[in-house]
Design a protein with these regions (language model features):
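N-terminal Rossmann-like NAD(P) cofactor-binding subdomain of oxidoreductases
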Residues: 1-135, 140-142, 233-237
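C-terminal substrate-binding/catalytic lobe of Rossmann-fold NAD(P)-dependent oxidoreductases
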Residues: 1-3, 12-13, 107-113, 117-244
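A generic structural signal for alpha-helix starts
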Residues: 89, 188-190, 249
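Short, electropositive, low-hydrophobicity segments enriched in small/polar residues
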Residues: 89-92, 123, 181, 252, ...
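Predominant activation on well-ordered alpha-helical scaffold segments within soluble catalytic domains
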Residues: 92-99, 148-152, 199, 231, ...
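An anion-binding loop in the catalytic cleft
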Residues: 236-240, 244-261
Length: 261
């Protein structure tokens, strides 16, 4: 391929492919990468979390983690973009501003996410996937899901404090959509203060919607859109709160966010 006539390339190949493409990486074309190959800052994390040795880590710094709502200015200046993972997108967007404002505790964040079976990609045939998930719910990646690496990485950057979440994923018998329940403890602020922080931060963000307090979104609301919808539910104690976020894993969690970036 003659890359000199191309401005942008969207890499939609599976993980462990782009980092081997020295010809593309050393060209002048800008890459929007939907794989994991350039999401992580630590070379060892690729081997520890994904089981492969990175072949072109020297260009890793040319990739900006592409969470548009928080990295807009950096994206404008970078050469390449590493598109965030689908689960990570649904989790990071509701949490980043709250951690910036020191509004929540970061040492006990628990996340339970549910995804449609399309999140498995094309490693299995559609009929086989439907058969596997029909009348079934399956939990996987408890404490060791691969997206934990980028979630911890991006949350730890906010206040330069190591942050580690406890995360589990579930596959549901629906084709698409992600719903993440994020359980947090507030940090000497009220639950209404949490709501106000999110409302102020996302008021002008086209693709982010915050529902009224105690209204909970469902995945059906966002299927086929690039939207992320957030709901807050007050807990049994004043410092307990559940954040519910929903996205379409194939749009905001993948292709739509790539175009947005």
């Amino acid at each position: 391929i003659n890359f000199s006539s191309i401005d942008y390339v969207f890499n939609c190949l599976p993980n462990e492919n782009l980092h081997k493409r020295s010809d593309l990486l050393k060209s002048d074309v800008s890459i929007i990468d939907l794989s994991v190959d350039f999401r992580l800052d630590d070379k060892n994390d690729y081997e520890n979390w994904y089981g492969f040795k990175h072949g072109n880590f020297e260009v890793n710094d040319e990739f900006q983690y592409g969470l548009t709502e928080f990295n807009r200015n950096k994206i404008k200046k970078c050469k390449h973009i590493a598109n965030p993972g689908c689960y990570a997108t649904s989790i990071l967007i509701p949490l980043i501003e709250l951690i910036k404002q020191n509004a929540i505790k970061t040492d006990d964040i628990v996340i339970d996410s549910k995804s449609g079976y399309s999140g498995a990609g094309k490693t299995k045939g559609k009929k086989e996937l439907i058969k596997e998930v029909n009348e079934n719910i399956r939990t996987y990646g408890i404490g060791d899901h691969k997206h934990i690496a980028e979630i911890n990485q991006e949350l730890s950057k906010i206040k330069n404090i190591q942050t580690e979440v406890f995360f589990a994923a579930n596959i549901l018998p629906v084709e698409r959509g992600i719903l993440s329940n994020i359980y947090i403890d507030t940090n000497e602020v009220s639950q209404n203060d949490i709501y106000d922080i999110l409302q102020k931060r996302f008021n002008d963000e086209h693709f982010i919607q915050l529902l009224p307090m105690n209204e909970i979104p469902s995945s059906r609301e966002v299927v086929g859109t690039n939207n992320l919808v957030i709901g807050l539910k007050k807990g049994y104690k004043e410092n307990k709160l559940c954040i519910v976020s929903v996205i379409d894993n194939l749009v905001k969690g993948a292709a739509g966010q790539a175009v947005q970036n």
